């Protein structure tokens, strides 16, 4: 009889309590867990629960230039490095993204500059 068959026969003869002790001994000896991995699958047609991840990249969207359009154009040029014509087209075409995929701190700083110039801004 092979070693595997002998071990299997020995395990067959154990009680439930003895098997539980054996599992604990294996976990301690080899540093493993006997817990079965849990696979979660969404049922067909069921909506998956949204994952609550913290957003790391933000888009700064100019919603409206407001009364201080010239100042907003100046700030847009400063932020983006665009030329006068391109910055004016961006401001005139609002709502449009001014900067995309920036950090939260950068997005808040850009928003503050644009709001100070008179614009309405959203950070998405």
UniProtKB/Swiss-Prot annotation:
Coiled coil (residue ranges): none
Gene3D superfamilies to which the protein is assigned, alphabetical: 3.30.1390.10, Single helix bin (1.20.5.710)
Cellular component per GO, a single term: cytosolic large ribosomal subunit
Keyword vocabulary terms for this entry: Ribonucleoprotein, Ribosomal protein
GO terms of biological process kind: translation
CDD domains: Ribosomal_L7_L12
InterPro entries per the UniProt record, alphabetical: Ribosomal_bL12 (IPR000206), Ribosomal_bL12_C (IPR013823), Ribosomal_bL12_C/ClpS-like (IPR014719), Ribosomal_bL12_oligo (IPR008932), Ribosomal_bL12_oligo_N_sf (IPR036235)
A GO MF label: mRNA binding
Function: Forms part of the ribosomal stalk which helps the ribosome interact with GTP-bound translation factors. Is thus essential for accurate translation.
Family, similarity comment: Belongs to the bacterial ribosomal protein bL12 family.
Subunit field text: Homodimer. Part of the ribosomal stalk of the 50S ribosomal subunit. Forms a multimeric L10(L12)X complex, where L10 forms an elongated spine to which 2 to 4 L12 dimers bind in a sequential fashion. Binds GTP-bound translation factors.
Protein name, entry field: Large ribosomal subunit protein bL12
Species this chain originates from: Desulfitobacterium hafniense (strain Y51)
């Amino acid at each position: 009889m092979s070693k595997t068959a002998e071990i299997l026969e020995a395990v067959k003869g154990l009680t439930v309590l003895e098997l539980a002790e054996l599992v604990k001994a294996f976990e301690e000896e080899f540093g493993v867990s006997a817990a079965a991995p849990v696979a979660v699958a969404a049922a067909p047609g069921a909506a998956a629960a949204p994952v609550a991840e913290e957003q790391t990249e933000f888009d700064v969207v100019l919603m409206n230039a407001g009364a201080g359009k010239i100042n907003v154009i100046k700030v847009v040029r400063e932020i983006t490095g665009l030329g006068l014509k391109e910055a004016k087209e961006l401001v005139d075409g609002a709502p449009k993204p001014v900067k995309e995929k920036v950090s939260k701190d950068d997005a808040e700083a850009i928003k503050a500059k644009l709001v100070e110039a008179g614009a309405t801004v959203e950070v998405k």
